[in-house]
Structures are given as structure tokens and as C-alpha cells.
Amino acid sequence: MFQFHAGSWESWCCCCCLIPGDRPWDRGRRWRLEMADTRSVHETRFEAAVKVIQSLPKNGSFQPTNEMMLKFYSFYKQATEGPCKLSKPGFWDPVGRYKWDAWSSLGDMTKEEAMIAYVEEMKKILETMPMTEKVEELLHVIGPFYEIVEDKKSGRSSDLTSVRLEKISKCLEDLGNVLASTPNAKTVNGKAESSDSGAESEEEAAQEDPKRPEPRDSDKKMMKKSADHKNLEIIVTNGYDKDSFVQGVQNSIHTSPSLNGRCTEEVKSVDENLEQTGKTVVFVHQDVNSDHVEDISGIQHLTSDSDSEVYCDSMEQFGQEESLDGFISNNGPFSYYLGGNPSQPLESSGFPEAVQGLPGNGSPEDMQGAVVEGKGEVKRGGEDGGSNSGAPHREKRAGESEEFSNIRRGRGHRMQHLSEGSKGRQVGSGGDGERWGSDRGSRGSLNEQIALVLMRLQEDMQNVLQRLHKLEMLAASQAKSSALQTSNQPTSPRPSWWPFEMSPGALTFAIIWPFIAQWLVHLYYQRRRRKLN
């Protein structure tokens, strides 16, 4: 009988085309060889895992629990000896009883399944074990088993990361919009709101005015372009707002000079965009003697039930007004904003630089614009949202009082502007062209803004220094009090030469009192005996 070995006679016959390679008996033999290979893989992994467990030191950094060792023991016995056929140990062997229970609980599990379970339990604790030669050998035999974990969680992790990235990007966009545009007042359905509310104020405006048409994609692009140049949402004031100049510097309107409707293409594009979004554009021409307002989408008077109420959300606004008061008190360009006369007409007093356009040449053709969100009317003495939120008082000048109210709703502000003598008056325009000349327009608005920031920074530094001074004084007082307490502590009665912690009197009492007690007991028994006798 010839004995054929794999890879010798059969392979030679297949190469010589004597025996076809796809015969049924050949395929069955290949299947048996593959099963043997798979069995050998499980066995090699099992043997490597057993070596790792056996090589663990008794006092090493990794100490498996008793339950874990019982699992490994039961799987090892099942993989090597098969199902448990031994009798249960007696009560005097509790460890043997625990082992027998763990082994018999596996039932009729096959050896291959026990090997696989042993290796799977090893994978759970493989990361916590120290890296040794046996562990490296086991890792080499097992292979990259972490791919399964990554494949299971890859879809969820990608979804979570995408959602988080979207939320973060949205928050960053909202924060950028808030930082790019300072709080500017705008009116929606006769109520004034500020533009620092971001997305929520837009949603509120949409709820209050549902009939307003939604802007198209082209309109949105135009609004983004106009917002890049500067925010157009400002309100014309008569000079009584302290913060209007600083906010107007950041929101100045860059337009070209025009007279009787002659504007450049830039202004026309902005006007068309504002017509689509339902905004009110107010143009002030200095060559017109009568007060008028060119309103595109209608005029609506500002009314509110809480005109006399004043609200403030934070103390930061009071600090901003105090810094502005100190800055305006000096002789500078800010003196114009508080030195005006309330009885003086708006057109003759001139407008602050917050609503000036491009610096002109002093001619009366310079055009000023004020854009107000929605339908509204800009009154004399109108204040913007960022300046009135921190003013809990009424200003009365020359018999004329102004009531301010700023109500926080969501993240936006509401305010109502009232003036007793001129509630029905609108923003007019005068012919005083000197106020609109290049002298005031050419002043660097950036210098004033930097000066204001420096003043606020200086105030913050002063506050920090005051706090540090208070902390130093508190620490010094605590040190003095602790020193006084230590000096006032009573001195111990024991002398310096005494070696024990107890005082000499306490030590002598502790030694003598047993003898005294014994003597008293002895006296008691003596008297008792005498009485009995």
C-alpha cells in the first residue's frame, strides 16, 4: 500500500493532469485540512492565553479577582478534560466546591467553545495587564481584535461628532454675530428691539410679523455683504445718548453723497435689499428746510404699557455709563453729546458721528441714513438699545422730560422713547452744513474707541488692585490675630525639665490612687469583721 502525503504524490498528479484538482474526495480532504487549521488557531490562542495566566506573579501589579479566576479555571477544565464528571467535594473543602460549581455550570460545552470563551475573557483584561513576553506572544497570535469594536461604534461616533460640530459651528456663528454688531435698537410692529439677540431676536420678529415676506437667497447674500461693511441698524438721536457715539462708530453707514435721490449703485442695492426685507429707510437731506422722513414701508408710533418702567439686566451696563461719564467730562469730541440744548431743533444741533456717512467735503450734499428694522418712527431724542439699558433714572432738561424703558425679552431688548413736548415730531433735517463738514467727519473714530477701551481697562485694573489690597489687609489681620491667640494661650504647668507630657501632679495622682483605693477597701473589711465578731 502506498501512503500519500499532502503536497507530494497528489500535487504531482494534479500538475501532470492525471488527477483533476476538483474531484469530490479532494475537496473533502481540503475541507478537513481547513478545519484542522482552524482548530489549531483556537488551540494556539488558548495555549498562549493559558501561558499568560500561569505567568502572572503573585504580588504583581495585576491581581485578578476570584470570580475571574473561577471563570478561567472552569473554561480551562472544560477545554482540556471536557464536561465535569467528578463528584462534589465535601463541606470541608469550600474552595473545591466553588471550583466544582463553576466547572459543572458549563454543562455540555464543547472543548472548542471553551477555548474560544477562555480567549474572549482574556481579551477583556488584556489592556490592564503589564506587557510581558507572554502577553506579546498572545497579542501576536490573537491579531487585531480591536477592529470589531471600531466597526460597531464607527457609525454612532461619526454621527455624534457631526452633530457636535454642527452645534459648535452654530454657536460660533452666533457669537461672531454678537461680537460683530453691538446692541442697536430696531423696531418691530411698533416695539423697539436691539440687534444683539442673534438668532432668537430674528425668530421673535418673525413671530410678531408673520405677514412679512421671507427674504430670498439673493437678499440674504446682499444683507451679509452689507453687514460686512458695517451694521446698518442704527437710530438717529439728538445727542443725549452717551453710548450712541461709540456704537455709531462701529455701525457707521458707508454711503456716497447724493442730492434729491442721486445715489450710487451701492446705496441703491442696499435700498432694494431693504425693500425686500420690510425695513424702513430714513434719509436726511440737509438742503431741505422742513422736517420730513422718507418712509418706504410705513410709519407707526411707538406705544407701550410700561413706558415709565426701567429695567436693567446686569451691573456691567452701569460700569459702562460711569466710564463714559468720566470720558465725556473732558474737553473732547464727546462734549457735544451732553452739551446740547433740548429746546434746540435737531436739524440745527447736528447729528453725532454715529450716523455720518463717508467723510465729505463740507458740502450740503452729504447724505445721512438711518435704517430701522420693520415699521416704526424715529422720534426726537430716540435712544438705542445698548445705552438705555443701564440708566434707571429720568433726565429733565429745560422743562422737557424723557422716559426710558428697556425690557429684556429673550436675548433682545425693547425700549420705548417718549418726549412730552414732541411726541408727534419726526426726524427732520436742517440746512446747517457746517456740522456735516469734513471737520467732524474726518476725526478718527478709532481713536475715541481705543480711548474708551483703555479707560475701561484702567478701571478694571483699579478694581483688581483694590481687591488685592483688601486681600493683603485681610491676610495681615489674620496673621496678627493668630499671633495674638498663640501669645494668649496659657502656659503649661509642667516645668521645662519635665520629660513627660503629663504634669507632675497628674502623674503622682495616677500612681498613688490605687494604693489609696486599696487602703479604703481594707478599712471597710476590717470594720465589717469587727461588727460580725
Curated annotation (Swiss-Prot):
UniProt keyword list: Acetylation, Autophagy, Coiled coil, Lipid-binding, Membrane, Peroxisome, Phosphoprotein, Transmembrane, Transmembrane helix, Transport
Entry-annotated residues carrying N6-acetyllysine: K470
SUPFAM superfamilies in alphabetical order: Acyl-CoA binding protein
Compositional bias ranges of the Basic and acidic residues kind: 208-227, 374-383, 432-442
One Pfam family matching this protein: ACBP
Known tissue expression: Highly expressed in brain and liver. Lower levels of expression in spleen and heart.
TM helices/strands, residue ranges: 503-525
InterPro entries, A to Z: ACBD5 (IPR016347), Acyl-CoA-binding_prot_CS (IPR022408), Acyl-CoA-binding_protein (IPR000582), Acyl-CoA-binding_sf (IPR035984), FERM/acyl-CoA-bd_prot_sf (IPR014352)
Protein name as it appears in the record: Acyl-CoA-binding domain-containing protein 5
Gene Ontology MF: a single term: fatty-acyl-CoA binding
Residues annotated as domain ACB: 42-131
Chain positions recorded as an acyl-CoA binding sites: 53-62, 73-77, 99, 118
Chain's role: Acyl-CoA binding protein which acts as the peroxisome receptor for pexophagy but is dispensable for aggrephagy and nonselective autophagy. Binds medium- and long-chain acyl-CoA esters.
Organism field: Bos taurus
Coiled coil regions in record: 448-478
Keyword check for Mitochondrion: no
The family this protein is said to belong to: Belongs to the ATG37 family.
GO biological process assignments: fatty acid metabolic process; pexophagy
Subcellular locations according to the entry: Peroxisome membrane
Modified residues (Phosphoserine): S194, S195, S197, S201, S244, S314, S429
